[in-house]
Amino acid sequence: MADFIDAFLIGDGEEAAAEIALCWTSAKREGLGRRARLVRLANLEGVYVPSLYATHVDADTGLEVVSGPALEPVPFPIRRRVLENLDRFPFPDDGPVGGPEAIFDRMSIEVARGCTEGCRFCQAGMIYRPVRERDPLEVVRTVERALEKSGQDEVSLTALSTADVSAISPLI
């Protein structure tokens, strides 16, 4: 993939998106070349730059596996970025789509990430760990603002397993 994709963010992007943009523009302003900018990006938590890592084909699976840094001192293994406190980044209470009634029939508000069940078959349940929930009062405020701004009269509370959200009863 190194031929096509410069960098991947592994994990949650709310904090990382701004860090990546600032890192890249700062390095560019400093006159660093492309490879040096990629090395700088790779040193941000959760950023994987394929061109900076060596890979090999696993004999058992036939899959290409990252074996470590190719040349530059970059982190290995790459740690997944986790946003510990969802409330630091409030869920948007208005959408970028004008006239949402033409496309959606309700507002969708994220109330939690992750899942408490740990089912072995569920990739999403494993990927989005640990479980994090939004503050119920913030959810209510977001719902009120979203309904006021959108003109909708319905809201869906979304999570991998909404019924398992600890404050779901009072929210309903």
How should each PLM-predicted stretch be described?
Residues F4-A7, R34, F76, A102, ...:
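A general structural-boundary detector
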Residues G13-A16, R40, R81-N85, L171:
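Alpha-helical structural motif
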Residues L83-I172:
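Radical SAM [4Fe-4S] cluster-binding motif and immediate context
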Residues P50, V57-S108:
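N-terminal [4Fe-4S]-dependent radical SAM core
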Residues M1-P69:
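Glycine-rich beta-alpha loop elements in corrinoid/cobalamin-binding modules
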